[in-house]
């Protein structure tokens, strides 16, 4: 059907009627400027309704700055536009553009009556909550996640959830233990489908972006993160790895972390450009593949800081690039830092003179396989024997690292020894070599098998219930149920997923690594009336992480109890010796010691189906559909503003806006507070003055207003219960002179190192002193682990 023909057909009657009802509600908000919609009695066309919604949203969304109700109403209108463009279930099932695979379409047809009842229930009940989330949520669904069909049609919200739930249910039924663990004995497709559907449309479980885009469809990979360690040592080997493995993963929209540490030949007659020639090819490939994609992905190159080309990599982006032949603006880098570098930097800070750092070439390649005391001993032996290619004062290298971070947004920083120390396998003599694009996945990658992680997150603000006296309280039972559901859901997606390369499929089969995280921590705390750094918030932060790990690990053990084989290396893992992830940390106090004791016994008897469990990823995209804060980070502004081709897009911090309305009972006072906030870049403290700690508005701080060391403390507090890692970003405000002191960033990295974290820095977000702009040295947009 031609696009014009479909859009000129009559809009569904219920959408046109709802549009008239919405117009009456606009009037109640005092928005007399909203034009009347096409009359429902005239059966307006889909195109007319879509055009009307676009006109009203464009006209009214600027008022979201002062009235959160307008923001919500604009979102509800966008959902009506989605309804106007939707098609019946039969057309959806047979859409060539959607391309549902038969394994998913056939169970939906076979259980059509149940599916239709489920859809109807969603539309009559839960959809109202989802429609009321806000404009950003509605636009993100419409523009990115809802599949585009023929003739300008789009899948409905209900069909979107059905597609994902049906895919998960179909593959769950292929493994009896999955269904039994999810819904009990005698699991049926309908029961499993309903469990997933409910968790999805209530936004308790939020899948990763690849799953939302490609679940049930004949294209795309469902995995989020790929870790590669091709162990290349020449340009020829690098080109082969890039054009085979890397290209195929990028074409499937996977985010990549790739270790090039083994390519450590110094510039010579035989190797004229060192590693940079290979990185330039990688950069060009990333640009070419992303250039025609609405959903770009990315690549992060991992190196250890003793690599002979580390200076070149630190200078490959932005203003630091010497010329176009070395510019790699489409790549990110991450330093895989051994403890020795920070120990030497600390010695320099303590006054020791002449502390140096030595760079090595391929004569020291074996250092990448060592960590801890073994690395230190061998590194210092190589120094004594004079095998280094360059020696630099350690403070000079630290300055180069921080300068690159501030000016280009890269490198990220991860701590090699912490990652190896807390890994579930013994890595002595065979150390881990890198992480993924977003620094939260810690897995082994080898020349014959990639590390692969499949992700989902639990939406913490949905785990809230009314307690005694109507006060809100966190529902730990809801968290545990959501985490267990997410674990089985991701396992099902792994079972049914298609992988871009054989090495990726081999890595999945070998490790079955889960990456279950959470999002909306800051939003949750605000709803519960807590400042993010209050003692109560710190306790809740740890208990959430503990319950999440417990639920996911217990589910994995249950799968083995019900007949699944443990992951391939279980017998050689620390788990087989009775150890848990938190046992590698000192001073851990468990809130549920008996539950953990029972789990230890269960693991000893049955094993674990998965090798890894929890990873706290950035949730940039999915936090937009839930209208919550990203991952575990505080909001970085109380009024997000982005200028696009279609105008300014605003996203207010809804808990703050509602608190303002509740606190300022007179409309004039509320609007005065809003104007003051607008003048002060939406800083509550700057606009309203110093508020008492118990004041209902005092807790609405942004990430830039928090002490960054205290935010690092929150990460360290929950680290024992995060067996992979956390994408920890830092938020720094530029001084009035426009110069961020290098020592400020380096001191935060040292603090993270001393706290024993695995990820020392993902992004360093810098707020300009003169305006509310945020500079990150380059915007990474990833459809993989960014969720």
UniProtKB/Swiss-Prot annotation:
It is an enzyme of class 1 (oxidoreductase). Its EC number is 1.17.4.1. The record marks 762-763 as: Important for electron transfer. One of its GO terms (biological process) is deoxyribonucleotide biosynthetic process. The active site is at residues 436, 438, 440. Coiled coil: none annotated. NCBIfam families: NrdE_NrdA. HAMAP family: HSV_RIR1. Ribonucleoside-diphosphate reductase holoenzyme provides the precursors necessary for viral DNA synthesis. Allows virus growth in non-dividing cells, as well as reactivation from latency in infected hosts. Catalyzes the biosynthesis of deoxyribonucleotides from the corresponding ribonucleotides. This is Ribonucleoside-diphosphate reductase large subunit.
């Amino acid at each position: 059907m031609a696009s014009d023909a479909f859009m000129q057909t009559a809009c569904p009657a219920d959408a046109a009627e709802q549009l008239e009802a919405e117009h009456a509600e606009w009037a109640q908000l005092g928005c007399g400027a909203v034009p009347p919609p096409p009359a429902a009695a005239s059966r307006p066309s889909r195109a007319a309704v879509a055009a009307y919604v676009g006109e009203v949203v464009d006209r009214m969304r600027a008022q979201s700055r002062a009235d959160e109700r307008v923001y919500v109403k604009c979102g509800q209108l966008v959902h009506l536009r989605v309804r106007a463009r939707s098609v019946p279930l039969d057309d959806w099932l047979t859409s060539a553009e959607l391309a549902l695979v038969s394994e998913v379409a056939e169970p939906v047809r076979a259980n059509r009556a149940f599916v239709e009842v489920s859809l109807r229930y969603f539309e009559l009940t839960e959809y109202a909550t989802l429609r009321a989330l806000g404009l950003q949520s509605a636009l993100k669904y419409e523009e990115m996640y809802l599949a585009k069909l023929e003739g300008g049609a789009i899948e409905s919200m209900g069909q979107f959830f059905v597609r994902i739930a049906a895919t998960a249910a179909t593959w769950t039924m292929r493994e009896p233990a999955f269904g039994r663990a999810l819904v009990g004995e005698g699991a049926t497709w309908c029961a499993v489908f309903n469990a997933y559907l409910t968790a999805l449309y209530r936004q308790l479980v939020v899948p990763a972006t690849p799953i939302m885009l490609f679940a049930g469809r004949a294209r795309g990979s469902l995995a989020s993160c790929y870790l590669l360690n091709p162990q290349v040592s020449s340009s020829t080997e690098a080109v082969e790895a890039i054009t085979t493995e890397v290209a195929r993963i990028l074409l499937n929209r996977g985010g990549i972390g790739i270790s090039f540490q083994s390519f450590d030949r110094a510039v010579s007659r035989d190797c004229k450009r060192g590693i940079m020639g290979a990185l330039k090819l990688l950069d060009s490939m990333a640009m070419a593949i992303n250039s025609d994609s609405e959903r770009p992905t990315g690549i992060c190159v991992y190196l250890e800081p003793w690599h002979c080309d580390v200076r070149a990599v630190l200078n490959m982006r932005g203003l630091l690039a010497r010329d176009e032949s070395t510019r790699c603006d489409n790549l990110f880098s991450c330093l895989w830092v051994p403890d020795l570098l920070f120990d030497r930097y600390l010695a320099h800070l303590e006054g020791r003179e002449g502390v140096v750092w030595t760079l090595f070439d391929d004569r020291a390649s074996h250092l990448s396989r060592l960590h801890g005391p073994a690395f230190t001993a061998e590194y210092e032996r190589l120094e004594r024997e004079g095998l280094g290619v360059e020696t630099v004062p350690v403070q000079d290298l630290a300055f180069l690292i921080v300068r690159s971070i501030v000016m280009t947004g890269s490198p990220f920083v991860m701590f090699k020894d912490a990652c190896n120390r807390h890994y579930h396998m013994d890595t002595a003599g065979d150390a881990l070599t890198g992480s993924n694009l977003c620094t939260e996945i810690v897995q082994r990658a080898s020349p014959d098998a990639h590390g692969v992680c499949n992700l989902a997150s639990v939406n913490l603000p949905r785990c809230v219930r009314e307690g005694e006296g109507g006060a809100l309280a966190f529902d730990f039972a809801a968290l545990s149920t959501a985490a267990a559901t997410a674990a089985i859901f991701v396992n099902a997606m792994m079972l049914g997923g298609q992988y871009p390369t054989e090495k990726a499929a081999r890595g999945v089969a070998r490790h079955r690594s889960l990456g279950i995280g959470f999002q909306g921590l800051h939003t949750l705390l605000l709803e519960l009336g807590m400042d993010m750094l209050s003692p109560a918030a710190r306790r809740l932060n740890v208990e959430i992480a503990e319950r999440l790990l417990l639920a996911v690990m217990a589910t994995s053990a249950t799968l083995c109890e019900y007949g699944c084989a443990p992951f391939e290396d279980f017998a050689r893992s620390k788990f087989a010796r009775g150890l848990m992830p938190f046992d590698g940390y000192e001073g851990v106090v468990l809130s549920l010691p008996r539950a953990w004791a029972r789990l230890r016994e269960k693991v000893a008897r049955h094993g674990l189906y998965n090798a890894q469990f929890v990873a706290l990823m950035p949730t940039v995209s999915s936090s937009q559909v839930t209208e919550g804060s990203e991952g575990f980070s505080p909001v970085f502004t109380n009024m997000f503003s982005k200028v696009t081709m279609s105008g300014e897009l605003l996203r207010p911090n809804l808990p703050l806006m509602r608190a303002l309305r509740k606190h300022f009972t007179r409309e004039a006072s509320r609007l005065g507070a809003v104007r003051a906030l607008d003048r002060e870049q939406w800083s509550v403290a700057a606009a309203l003055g110093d508020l008492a700690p118990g004041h209902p508005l005092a807790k609405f701080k942004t990430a830039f207003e928090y002490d960054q060391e205290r935010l690092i403390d929150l990460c360290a507090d929950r680290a024992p219960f995060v067996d992979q890692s956390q994408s920890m970003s830092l938020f720094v405000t530029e001084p009035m002179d426009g110069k961020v002191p290098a020592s400020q960033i380096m001191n935060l990295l040292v603090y993270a190192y001393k706290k024993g974290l695995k990820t020392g820095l993902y992004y360093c977000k810098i707020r300009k002193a003169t305006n509310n702009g945020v500079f990150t040295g380059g915007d990474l947009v990833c459809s993989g682990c960014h969720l």
